[in-house]
Curated annotation (Swiss-Prot):
Keywords: Cytoplasm, Fatty acid biosynthesis, Fatty acid metabolism, Lipid biosynthesis, Lipid metabolism, Magnesium, Metal-binding, Transferase. It catalyses: apo-[ACP] + CoA = holo-[ACP] + adenosine 3',5'-bisphosphate + H(+). The keyword Nucleotide-binding does not apply. Pfam families: ACPS. Its main location: cytoplasm. This is Holo-[acyl-carrier-protein] synthase. It comes from the Bacteria. It is found in: Cytoplasm.
Length: 133
């Protein structure tokens, strides 16, 4: 059963301008250590950060909160499953909100797709629940 859907699209050039203007201040405020390690190693650094930014926005929409009600940027981070598939790791207020949304006897699964085609990056998040084993 789907309990949340969110999407976001962002202009990579806007992220590049933000990186140029604010640099580490922007990165440290928004991104997790895992996200920074992934993005800093990429040739298309701004596109990598843009996809992750869009994923956070999409996830906050799927949670039904946006960036409020105790949900902060670093509470959500893009991580990869063993096979390489992206998903979101939640902590803090984002994790608390997910727990509130999840019906008893079920567990939440976060599906994420991220893509970029210059000048845009996009993310789509679906939060579903499945019965606990």
């Amino acid at each position: 059963m789907i309990i949340g859907i969110g999407n976001d699209i962002i202009d990579i050039r806007r992220v590049q301008k933000t990186l140029d203007r604010f640099g580490d201040r922007f990165i440290e405020r928004i991104f997790t250590e895992v996200e920074k390690a992934k993005s800093e190693g990429r040739r298309m650094r701004a596109a990598s950060y843009a996809k992750r930014f869009a994923a956070k926005e999409a996830c906050s929409k799927a949670l039904g909160t946006g960036m409020r009600r105790g949900v902060f940027w670093k509470d959500m981070g893009v991580v990869n499953l063993r096979g390489g598939q992206p998903t979101m790791a939640l902590t803090g207020g984002a994790l608390e909100r997910l727990k509130e949304m999840t019906p008893e006897g079920t567990e939440a699964v976060i599906h994420l797709t991220i893509t970029d085609d210059h000048p845009q990056a996009q993310a789509f998040v679906i939060i579903s629940v499945v019965p606990k084993p």
